[in-house]
Amino acid sequence: MRILVANDDGYLAPGLAALVAVCKEFGDVEVVAPEQNASGTSNALTLTRPLSVHTAANGFRYVNGTPSDCVHVALTGLLAQRPDLVVSGINNGANMGDDTIYSGTVAAAMEGYLFGVPAIAFSLVDKGWSHLDAATRAARGVLAHVLASGWHREHWLLNVNIPSRPDAAELPLQITRLGKRHASEPVICQTSPRGEPIYWIGAAGDAREAGEGTDFHAVANGHVSITPLQVDLTDHGRLGTWSQRWQDHGSRA
């Protein structure tokens, strides 16, 4: 079993080290992670400059780019053999609902999925690495179940969110759908030392759709949430509607 591990918090993040230690229990591990924190970079690839890859004292390789860069470079030139599984995390903070659109953690896993490799993104819901040991045990349980069941031979993408509590690995896992958040808080306007206005992106909105069956509901009740994701952004439910509209008004631009 060959496992590629990435993240978006950077190669020095405690969550990465914890996940790598777990993955080594299941196979040969390669680590390719960002040089710096790259949270919120989504699926961005660096196309305007070359990327550099260096090796840290602990053997982790790090890239001066995004999480997607890391997995892309690993799969298309850096690794001698294709991995059997790509895992990302453990992230410092939740990636639930709309977070998945912006998440570098999810994007790193998705990059593996786009190359045909099954992939899992792991996130610890509260920031600050509280109960990282429990989250690590939960991640171990997910990996053990996936690998023992032979599901790693299939093609899928899973988003796993782990509640920040000491018993995170003890309650039953829940398969969930993505919930939704309210709009983000307004930007925070400040003034630079030069007197120019500068802006910080506001905090993520609170949960808006968090009913039973959602990732928000699962973690709020102490359960590890596992959400199967897909990449197809087509609005299949409205294909017929838009096709009919275009026919009714002529098909030319």
From Swiss-Prot:
Residues binding a divalent metal cation, per UniProt: D8, D9, S39, N91
Broadest EC class assigned to this enzyme: hydrolase
Subcellular location, record wording: Cytoplasm
Cofactor comment text: Binds 1 divalent metal cation per subunit.
Function: Nucleotidase that shows phosphatase activity on nucleoside 5'-monophosphates.
Plastid recorded as keyword: no
Protein's UniProt name: 5'-nucleotidase SurE
Family: Belongs to the SurE nucleotidase family.
Cofactor or coenzyme needed: a divalent metal cation
Metal-binding recorded as keyword: yes
EC number(s) recorded for this UniProt protein: 3.1.3.5
GO molecular function terms attached to this record: 3'-nucleotidase activity; 5'-nucleotidase activity; exopolyphosphatase activity; metal ion binding; nucleotide binding
